[in-house]
Amino acid sequence: MKFVLLFGVLLVTLFSYSSAEMLDDFDQADEDELLSLIEKEEARKDCIPKHHECTSNKHGCCRGHLFKYKCQCTTVVTQSGEETERCFCGTPPHHKAAELVVGFGKKIFG
Protein backbone atom coordinates (compact mmCIF):
# COMPACT_ATOMS: atom_id res chain seq x y z
CA MET A 1 0.00 0.00 0.00
CA LYS A 2 2.87 2.34 0.83
CA PHE A 3 4.37 1.65 -2.60
CA VAL A 4 1.11 2.58 -4.37
CA LEU A 5 0.79 5.76 -2.30
CA LEU A 6 4.42 6.72 -2.97
CA PHE A 7 3.98 5.96 -6.67
CA GLY A 8 0.78 8.07 -6.76
CA VAL A 9 2.48 11.06 -5.09
CA LEU A 10 5.42 10.77 -7.48
CA LEU A 11 3.05 10.58 -10.45
CA VAL A 12 1.08 13.65 -9.31
CA THR A 13 4.33 15.58 -8.74
CA LEU A 14 5.65 14.72 -12.20
CA PHE A 15 2.32 15.57 -13.80
CA SER A 16 2.13 18.97 -12.09
CA TYR A 17 5.75 19.73 -13.04
CA SER A 18 5.20 18.78 -16.69
CA SER A 19 1.96 20.78 -16.91
CA ALA A 20 3.73 23.81 -15.38
CA GLU A 21 6.48 23.48 -18.00
CA MET A 22 3.87 23.25 -20.77
CA LEU A 23 2.10 26.35 -19.46
CA ASP A 24 5.41 28.22 -19.40
CA ASP A 25 6.04 27.14 -22.99
CA PHE A 26 2.57 28.32 -24.02
CA ASP A 27 3.09 31.65 -22.25
CA GLN A 28 6.43 32.10 -24.02
CA ALA A 29 4.81 31.23 -27.36
CA ASP A 30 2.03 33.76 -26.69
CA GLU A 31 4.59 36.44 -25.86
CA ASP A 32 6.59 35.66 -29.01
CA GLU A 33 3.43 35.77 -31.12
CA LEU A 34 2.38 39.07 -29.57
CA LEU A 35 5.80 40.61 -30.23
CA SER A 36 5.66 39.35 -33.81
CA LEU A 37 2.23 40.93 -34.31
CA ILE A 38 3.44 44.22 -32.82
CA GLU A 39 6.46 44.23 -35.16
CA LYS A 40 4.23 43.52 -38.17
CA GLU A 41 1.89 46.34 -37.14
CA GLU A 42 4.84 48.73 -36.88
CA ALA A 43 6.03 47.65 -40.34
CA ARG A 44 2.51 48.16 -41.68
CA LYS A 45 2.47 51.73 -40.36
CA ASP A 46 5.75 52.48 -42.13
CA CYS A 47 4.69 51.02 -45.49
CA ILE A 48 3.58 53.07 -48.49
CA PRO A 49 -0.15 52.74 -49.36
CA LYS A 50 -1.51 51.98 -52.82
CA HIS A 51 -1.28 54.85 -55.37
CA HIS A 52 1.25 56.76 -53.23
CA GLU A 53 4.73 57.68 -54.40
CA CYS A 54 7.52 55.16 -53.77
CA THR A 55 10.36 56.72 -55.78
CA SER A 56 12.67 56.96 -52.77
CA ASN A 57 11.68 53.59 -51.20
CA LYS A 58 10.93 51.06 -53.93
CA HIS A 59 10.59 48.09 -51.56
CA GLY A 60 8.36 49.77 -48.98
CA CYS A 61 4.90 49.21 -50.47
CA CYS A 62 2.12 47.81 -48.26
CA ARG A 63 0.33 44.49 -48.69
CA GLY A 64 -2.87 44.25 -50.66
CA HIS A 65 -5.60 41.65 -50.16
CA LEU A 66 -3.49 38.75 -51.47
CA PHE A 67 -0.17 40.20 -52.63
CA LYS A 68 2.23 42.96 -51.68
CA TYR A 69 1.89 46.04 -53.89
CA LYS A 70 4.78 46.60 -56.30
CA CYS A 71 6.53 49.87 -56.98
CA GLN A 72 5.78 50.69 -60.62
CA CYS A 73 7.90 53.38 -62.28
CA THR A 74 7.39 55.54 -65.35
CA THR A 75 9.51 58.20 -67.02
CA VAL A 76 7.90 61.63 -66.95
CA VAL A 77 8.97 64.67 -68.98
CA THR A 78 8.70 67.86 -66.94
CA GLN A 79 7.74 71.27 -68.34
CA SER A 80 11.41 72.18 -68.63
CA GLY A 81 11.97 69.13 -70.87
CA GLU A 82 13.85 67.13 -68.26
CA GLU A 83 13.07 63.42 -67.90
CA THR A 84 12.51 62.16 -64.36
CA GLU A 85 11.43 58.82 -62.97
CA ARG A 86 8.20 58.74 -60.93
CA CYS A 87 7.09 55.64 -59.08
CA PHE A 88 3.90 54.62 -57.29
CA CYS A 89 2.72 51.55 -55.40
CA GLY A 90 0.23 49.53 -57.38
CA THR A 91 -1.02 46.07 -58.26
CA PRO A 92 0.65 44.45 -61.28
CA PRO A 93 -1.73 43.07 -63.95
CA HIS A 94 -0.98 39.40 -63.18
CA HIS A 95 -1.76 40.02 -59.49
CA LYS A 96 -5.04 41.72 -60.48
CA ALA A 97 -5.95 38.67 -62.57
CA ALA A 98 -5.14 36.29 -59.70
CA GLU A 99 -7.22 38.36 -57.26
CA LEU A 100 -10.11 38.37 -59.75
CA VAL A 101 -9.98 34.57 -60.10
CA VAL A 102 -9.80 34.07 -56.33
CA GLY A 103 -12.69 36.49 -55.75
CA PHE A 104 -14.76 34.75 -58.41
CA GLY A 105 -13.95 31.36 -56.87
CA LYS A 106 -15.02 32.57 -53.43
CA LYS A 107 -18.35 33.77 -54.81
CA ILE A 108 -19.02 30.46 -56.53
CA PHE A 109 -17.81 28.06 -53.83
CA GLY A 110 -18.66 30.20 -50.81
From Swiss-Prot:
It is found in: Secreted. Keywords: Disulfide bond, Knottin, Secreted, Signal, Toxin. Belongs to the neurotoxin 19 (CSTX) family. 03 subfamily. Its main location: secreted. The keyword Iron-sulfur does not apply. This is U1-lycotoxin-Ls1ii. It comes from Lycosa singoriensis (Wolf spider). Disulfide bonds join C47-C62, C54-C71, C61-C89, C73-C87. Coiled coil: none annotated.
